[in-house]
Every structure is written in C-alpha cells, then in structure tokens.
Amino acid sequence: MAIPGRQYGLILPKKTQQLHPVLQKPSVFGNDSDDDDETSVSESLQREAAKKQAMKQTKLEIQKALAEDATVYEYDSIYDEMQKKKEENNPKLLLGKDRKPKYIHNLLKAVEIRKKEQEKRMEKKIQREREMEKGEFDDKEAFVTSAYKKKLQERAEEEEREKRAAALEACLDVTKQKDLSGFYRHLLNQAVGEEEVPKCSFREARSGIKEEKSRGFSNEVSSKNRIPQEKCILQTDVKVEENPDADSDFDAKSSADDEIEETRVNCRREKVIETPENDFKHHRSQNHSRSPSEERGHSTRHHTKGSRTSRGHEKREDQHQQKQSRDQENHYTDRDYRKERDSHRHREASHRDSHWKRHEQEDKPRARDQRERSDRVWKREKDREKYSQREQERDRQQNDQNRPSEKGEKEEKSKAKEEHMKVRKERYENNDKYRDREKREVGVQSSERNQDRKESSPNSRAKDKFLDQERSNKMRNMAKDKERNQEKPSNSESSLGAKHRLTEEGQEKGKEQERPPEAVSKFAKRNNEETVMSARDRYLARQMARVNAKTYIEKEDD
C-alpha cells in the first residue's frame, strides 16, 4: 500500500542503512545434513514472496503518481529543456555557435583570382609555343576533353560579365563620360517615370537654409546689396572660365599692377569717409561765420527755408547712402576678385610644386640605378686593367728569372754530357764484359719497346720514329764537334788520335751493323739530355693517346 502524503517526481532518495544478512557459521565437523537444505528452501521462498510484495507496491505507487501528473517520469525531456534555457541565457555560447570566419572568404576569393590568372598565363605560354612551332603539328588531331570544353565556356562567360561590368562602370562614372548624354538620359527616365526623382533637391536645400539676421554691424551688407554682389561674383567667375589664357595673364602681371589696384580702392574708401565729414565741417563754418545781427535776420528766413533745407538734406543723405552702398559693392567685388586671383595663383603654384615633386620622385630611382650601373662598369674595367697589369708584371718577372737559369742549365748539361761521353768511351775500351751486358740489356729493352709500340696508337709510333731520327742526328753532330775540338792539339798527337779514332769508328760501325734493328729502345739507359727529352716526349704522346681513347673526361686538379 502507498503511504499517504508521499511526494512524487525527481526526489533524491535518502541513504538508508543496508541490512546485511546474518551468515550462519558452518559446523565444526562440516557435515551438511538434510535439515539445512529444508531451512534454505524456506528462506528462498520467503525472499521471493517479499520481492513480489514490493513489486506490487511499486506498481501501485507508479499508477497513483501517473494519475496525479502524467509528466512525472519524463526526466530526460525536462533536463534537455533546462539545458536549452541555460544556453539561450548565456551569450558566450551563442556567439561561439553563430561565429563566422572573418578572413577565409576573402582568402578564397583571392585564391580563385590567382588561379584564373595562372590559367591565363599558361594559355599565353602555350600560344607562344605554338607560334614558335610555326604550324608543324597542324596536321595532327587535337583531343579535347569535355571538362576542358566546360572550362573554356565558363571562362568566356566570365569575360562577358567583366566586359558588362566595365561598360556599366564607364556609363556611370562621370570622369569616363565624354559628353552629357548620361545626364540627359537620367533626366528623361525621371520625366517618364522609369526612375524615381531624388528627394533632396537644390531648391529644398536652399529653402532649408536659414538666412542670418543682421546684427547691426557696419561691415555687414544688407540682403538687397548681397544679390548684386553675388551677381558680380558670378560674372567674374564666368569671365575667368571663358578666358583660358587668364592663368598666364595673371602670372604675367607685375607687382605694379597690384599696387595700382590697391591705390584705387584706398582712394574710393577715403572719398566715402571724407564726404560726410566735409559736409558737416562746411555747415559748421557757415554757422560760425555769421554775426548775431545776421542770425536774427536769418531767423525769419530760416522758418521759410526750413522745409527746403530739410528736403535738400534728406536728398543728400539718400545720395550719400547710395554712394556708400556702391562703394561697398565695388570694394567687396574688388576684394572677392583679388581673393579669387590669389587662390588661383596659389592653386597653380601648389599644382606646379606637386608636379615637380612627382617628377623628382620618379627621377630619383632612375638616377640611382644609372649611378649603380656606371659604378659597376667602372669597377669591372678597373679590375681588368689591374689584372692585366699584374699578369704582365708576373710574366716579365718569370721570364727574367728563367733566362739566366736556362743558360746555366744548358752549360751544366753540356759539361755533364762531355764528361759522360769520356767515361763511356773509357769503359768500352777497358771492359768487354760491360759491352756484352749492355747488349743484353739493349735487346730486352728493344723487345719491351716493340710491345709498347704495338699497344700504343699509330700517332705515338710516328712520334717515336721522328724522335729517334732526331736523336741519331744530334749524336752525329756531337761526334763531329768533338772531332773538331780534338784536331786542335799538336800534329803528332792529332795523327795518332786520328788513327785511333778511325779504328774506333770502324769497330763501332761494325758493331752497329751486327746489332739488330731493334737495338734502339726507349728503355735504353738515359745518359744524356737528348735521351731524357725523347723519353718525356714519348711519355706525353702515350698520355695523349690514352686521353683520346677515353670516352669520359677526367677532372683536372688545380
């Protein structure tokens, strides 16, 4: 049964003490008997009965709560509504949700514009390449995809839109219009009723302006006098606009003209000021000059002439006022004219200054670039001159150093050759074993030389032959020079020496004839300068042949 006066809905239950079931201690011996089974069954039945009773009770409570309020158990929907109200009341969350990007739209537009410009550049590049080809591939078929056709169509539409926008801007822009046709078209549309007449017009604006009340100052001009002044100003403006050469005329005028105009205006002012004072002084002097008797006589006349004098005085005052108004008008017109002229001159001067400044700003970077270029050219020429002078001095110094060293080397080499030839002859004469050993070495060297010749290119072989011939010619010349030098001693010694030489030459010729043609070898002992030089030449020839045969290029070390 439900407890009367119980609340329903979202009610937090109070913490109740949990009832722990009492656990029965097992028996000491641990023997489970039949009595224990019976007790456990009865306990389980009691528990189930208690649960059923509780379920019935809760069902009854639920039914009663629903009967009182149908929305008692709608917890989720109520909670969601509460959260929505919180979010609506919190402005920060609303700003976070409705927040839109500030800059991404402009960036995306800029990206699209750049893409279009890039496509236009690529098309121009392709067009140039086709022009360079000069119709080589006109016979070939051109394959165009549907996407490319679509892109071309879109581009043509965009170009048409841009042209329309440019034409509209040119029509609406006043600076781009050549005549007043656009203005008259607007007037016609307004008259017909296609366009609405603007609310604010010049008349309404003029009527809205309140006229200033005169405050009684002497410098102020009345409203009547203001109208002719405005007319004069308008006339002067029209004259200035009609005369296009007025600017040059104003510039050509000297300071003398300005002084003349100022003197005229000052004279007019002095006349205006002096006229009432002179009239007043003249009237007083006449009164003072009269005697008292005359005053008595004139008193009777004064009444008769009073009306006349008063009328004349009024006329004078009217004339004086008219003169003052005219002078003031002239003064104001002159002043306005001078102001306009000065402002026009000032505008011209400022325009010239701005024009000159603009030209100077444009000329500055050009002059700077020209100076930098001239400095670079001058530096290059100077460096070249310095470099050429240094090279010439270096070459001279090297030549001066090499000349004496070359002379000394030649002398030393010639001496060494002579000594070596002497030693060699003595060895040949004294030792036959040395000759046999040298023959063997020469044979081995000649065989190696032939192998190298076979391996080397035909160019190197031809060079080797030519060098061998030169070497043999030099040897003969050296032998002849030695013979001439040895003929100078006494006749007895010369006769004996001649016989000895003849015998030696005969022996050497026989030996040379006995030697095979391979006797001359590149590996023969290098005992003089000629043989050393020929070996160098052969080595260089072999290197050149190898370089020519190579398919690649080796990097040269500095």
Curated annotation (Swiss-Prot):
Residues 104-170, 379-427 form a coiled coil. It comes from the Eukaryota. GO terms for molecular function: mRNA binding; RNA binding. Residues 299-310 have a biased composition (Basic residues). Keywords: Coiled coil, Disease variant, Epilepsy, Intellectual disability, Isopeptide bond, mRNA processing, mRNA splicing, Nucleus, Phosphoprotein, RNA-binding, Ubl conjugation. It is found in: Nucleus; Nucleus speckle. The keyword Nucleotide-binding does not apply. GO terms for biological process: developmental process; in utero embryonic development; mRNA processing; regulation of alternative mRNA splicing, via spliceosome; RNA splicing. InterPro entries: NRP1_C, Nsrp1, NSRP1_N. It holds the Pfam family NSRP1_N. Residues 21-54, 204-534 are annotated as: Disordered. There is a cross-link at residues 199, 210, 281 (Glycyl lysine isopeptide (Lys-Gly) (interchain with G-Cter in SUMO2)). Induction: Up-regulated in motile T-cells. The modification Phosphoserine is found at residues 27, 33, 248, 254-255, 457. Residues 204-215, 250-280, 311-442, 449-487, 501-517 have a biased composition (Basic and acidic residues). Belongs to the NSRP1 family. Interacts (via C-terminus) with SRSF1. Interacts (via C-terminus) with SRSF2. It is linked to Neurodevelopmental disorder with spasticity, seizures, and brain abnormalities: An autosomal recessive disorder characterized by developmental delay apparent in infancy, impaired intellectual development with poor or absent speech, epilepsy, variable microcephaly, hypotonia, and spastic cerebral palsy. Brain abnormalities include simplified gyral pattern, defects of the operculum, and vermian hypoplasia. Death in early childhood may occur. RNA-binding protein that mediates pre-mRNA alternative splicing regulation. This is Nuclear speckle splicing regulatory protein 1. It comes from Homo sapiens (Human).
